[in-house]
Amino acid sequence: MSDSLQDEAGDPSKDADSYWQNLLGFPIDPWLGISDSALKECYVALGVVSERWNRSEKLMRFFTAHYAGIPEPIAPLVMRHLNNLSVTDLLSDCSDFIENDSADFREAIEFLCKLFSRCRENRNTLVHSSLVLNIPKRSADRIIKPSSPRAAEAKTFACTVDDIKRIADDIQHLNGVFVNLAYALECRKDPTKFWNPSRTPADFLRLCKFHLPDKLTLLAPE
C-alpha cells in the first residue's frame, strides 16, 4: 500500500484509542491503562513487590547456605538446584538440629520460615493474577487468579493498591528479619564485633517478633 493510501486509511491504533475514549468518556493511556488513575499506582506497587521479592529470594539462599555451613565457593552451585519450598524446608530442618538447646533462636528461624512462606504466597497470588478494573472509580479493587493444574476454578481476591503496597512492605520487613537474624548469629559467635559491647543476641532476636501478615482475602464465587 502506498504512503498516500495509508494516510487516507488513517492509523488503526489511533482510531481504536479514539473509539474507546469516546465510549468511556476519558483519555486512554496506551501503556499503563487509564490515565490519571490508581491503576498506574497499582503497576508501580507491583514493581516494588517484584524488586523486593527478588532480594528476599537471594537473602533466603544466602542465609540458608551460611547457616547450614555450606562452603561459600560451592553454596551457589547447591542452592540454585533448590526451589523456594525446598530452601525453606532445609533451613527449618537445620534449625531443628542446630538449635536443639536454643529455643529462642529456633523460634526466630521458624518465624522467618513462616514469614517467607506467607510473603511468597501473597506475592505469587499477585503476580499470577489479573487486575480487575473498576471503571467508574478508575482503579482496581480485585484480582483474578486463573485456573491451573492445581486449581480447577479461577479465584477472585479483594485487592486494592493499598493491599499491594502492604505486601511490598511485608516483604521489606522480611528482608529486615534476615539482617537481624544474621546479626544475632554473629553476636552469639563473637559479641566483640559490634560497636556496642552490651548488645546481646536477644536484642536482635527481639526485632524478629511480630504478627504474620494477612493473606489476601479470597472472595466467594459470584
Spell out what each predicted region is:
Residues S2-E51, K58-E222:
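Acidic, Ser/Thr/Gly/Pro-rich intrinsically disordered interaction regions
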